[in-house]
Amino acid sequence: MKKITHTYSNPKQAVLPILIQDYLDICDPVLTFDRFMGEIDLEKYLKEIPKHEVGRLRYNPVSMLKTILFGFMTNGYVSLRELEDSCKVNLRFMYLMDHEVPSYRTFGYFINEILSDSIEKLFCDINQKIFEKEHTDLQHLYIDGSKFEANANKYSWVWKKATEKSRYRLFEKITSLFQEINLELQYTGIKFRINTEYSPEYLKEAASKYVEIWQLDEATFVAGKGHRKSVQQRHYEKLKEYLSKLNEYVEKIQICGDGRNSYSKTDHSATFMRIKKDYMGNDQLLPAYNVQVGVADEYIAVVDVNQYRSDMDCFIPLMNKFHDIYGFYPKYPVADADYGSYNNYIFCEQNGLEKYMKFPMFKKETTDRNYHEYPFRAVNFKIDGDGKMRCPNGKGFHLQYRKAIKENAYGREEEIYQCEDCSGCPYAEKCKKGEGNRTVRVNQELTKMHQEVIQNLESIQGALLRMNRSIQAEGTFGIIKNDRWYKRIVRRGIKSVQLEVYLVSLGHNLYKFHNKQMKIKSAA
């Protein structure tokens, strides 16, 4: 008979950990992070927490704030469930939370209800602490923008112009209906006013008045097979239908506002834009946000979330935000050709900023010699002693009129000149396209600005700044998107998206700060 024996010994002894940091390396990111955050008064951002007199004790809000920021520092973007799971199994998060494990709902409440109002101030204070330690140069700001796809359905667009066209077609239907009603009421002496446009309030008032005139009761209305609606019922139901449609159109136009032409039904703050990475393969517009950053010494000094498709419209809000944070404007804002507009150059002149933003034709102007020296361009026409512009054939150009540029904040005007006589000109084929005398549009002020920008950017300093911008500003988005895997907005609504982008930017800056500190230690 086989003898069966059991071994009850356990070679693994129970170990009581005294301090979690004993298990962490001395250069561990969480220790660098904790020492740095200990120098900042975090409690002043947590004063708005409502007090509860019943229930379990609240989690330490300072520890929760540190845990959230550290999650964004290490992961680039961290979800609420990842935070909860990390507090259970990750020593770094256990160290920050002191072995407590808040649920993902608790983290969500903390971020949305407590951090949303103070995140911008927290971003500013952490940045200023980093910049003070790193002696960051804020006079040179490298600017870039990138479009991040919103968390919205792809085919959920609402177009402002299409809505306006539908509204005008509805106005025509309302006019026809009022004409029928007035014909119906011609013997009563009552008449509804007919306009080219109608407001929902007027339509609502007209419907109420129509009910009062005919003493209509909706409970007596008929519907379905075998029933014939009265004229009054049909007119009243049409009024109600048109009122509902008009309210819908008005709401859509109000959501779009003056600054954009579209929005998404599933995220009203998202605007449809063309994104560089067309993964759908059909050149389709996608709901997105335009995220702008100003980078100084590899740190994100200022960040802004916009609903504008063009980067030109984002420059002035970004500079004003920088001024609100630091109390001054950067001396050298360096940006690519998407930012070089008349409005932005005038803003720089008024606020003491140097013009280091390219304009749209900068590359062609500086690299294509044939284009730059082309004699038939209006900017290359000679000016005679009387100040008159003359073409290569010696013909003078006379000022016809001045035209205001649409949507220009500083009253920019274009001057329209026409040649005195182009008949029989040997250069006509190269100089003009039409049959009449050549007409040119000139803005001398903008031309001088372009020459100043070329002079700035073609200098040795300008070349170094351009190179640095491509490394730092574009490199920042490269790190965020490809190294730290934050490629798409998760939250919905402009305020929530701004909160999310601030957290990602804070995580990036803390991540950079830790890496630089480690490089200094390894060099020593």
Residue ranges and their predicted role:
Residues 1-31:
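Hydrophobic alpha-helical membrane-insertion signals
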Residues 1-5, 51-55, 461-464:
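A ubiquitous short alpha-helical element
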Residues 19, 63-69, 106:
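A general alpha-helix detector
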Residues 26-66, 72:
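Basic, short loop/linker segments at the boundary and entry of helix-turn-helix/winged-helix-like folds
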Residues 51, 70-73, 93, 113:
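General structural signal for alpha-helix termini and helix-helix connectors
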Residues 51-57, 93, 491-493:
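A short glycine/serine-rich beta->alpha loop
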Residues 68, 76-89, 100-524:
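Anion-binding and metal-coordination hotspots
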Residues 94-98:
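Short arginine-rich
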